[in-house]
Amino acid sequence: MFGIISAGLAPGIALLMYFYLKEKYESEPIHMVIRLFILGVLLVFPTMFIQYVLEKEHISEGSFVVSFLTSGFLEEFLKWFLLMVSTFQHIDFDEHYDGIVYGTSLSLGFATLENILYLIGNGVEYAFMRALLPVSSHALFGVIMGFYIGKARFSDSKTKMKWLLCSLFIPALLHGLYDYILLALKNWIYFMLPFMAFLWWFGLRKAKKARSVKTGGQPLQQ
């Protein structure tokens, strides 16, 4: 059991430290990162309950609905809602990159517990593939969500709503595509590899842009 828990924890902690240590100007208080990680862990339980109810009520049927609604939109909406409530007006949210730290912290808390539960049920031999795919993808959805939340935080009132909508719907769409590839496509690996390559490119590009701007600097480009 210790080996399974360690294998489940390791990729999430490693990715979280990677994005946390990339902050260029002023690192976020560690208590904020831990708090958001724990919130992400706790979010797994209501998410699983809602998904269970949707399945039992036959609302969630078919690969498309499961991928884009029950998984993609539901999970990203709940993460987005928690981020907005707990961080958007927080005094420590004073740099664009902070949104990325917050987004990855919460997303990786969610992904880490999900990963541990999967490995307990299916075996530690899946740990490597889980680290490459679901854990990494959750981290990158968090990066993208946090990037656009950061844009909204430091934008004027005319563009704030646009970036808030982007912060929800772009990660939800990408998450839905990820799940649809897994659930609906027969030779999914041939589609998943280029999709993950794109996701890493897109996420790291957003992280680099956010790191380049300090509060009071030039507005971030999309």
From Swiss-Prot:
Its main location: membrane. One of its GO terms (molecular function) is peptidase activity. Residues 24-30, 122-129, 204-222 are cytoplasmic. It is found in: Cell membrane. One of its GO terms (cellular component) is plasma membrane. Its EC number is 3.4.-.-. The gene is prsW. This is Protease PrsW. Residues 54-99, 152-180 are extracellular. Involved in the degradation of specific anti-sigma factors. Responsible for Site-1 cleavage of the RsiW anti-sigma factor. This results, after two other proteolytic steps catalyzed by the RasP and ClpXP proteases, in the release of SigW and the transcription activation of the genes under the control of the sigma-W factor. It comes from Bacillus licheniformis (strain ATCC 14580 / DSM 13 / JCM 2505 / CCUG 7422 / NBRC 12200 / NCIMB 9375 / NCTC 10341 / NRRL NRS-1264 / Gibson 46).
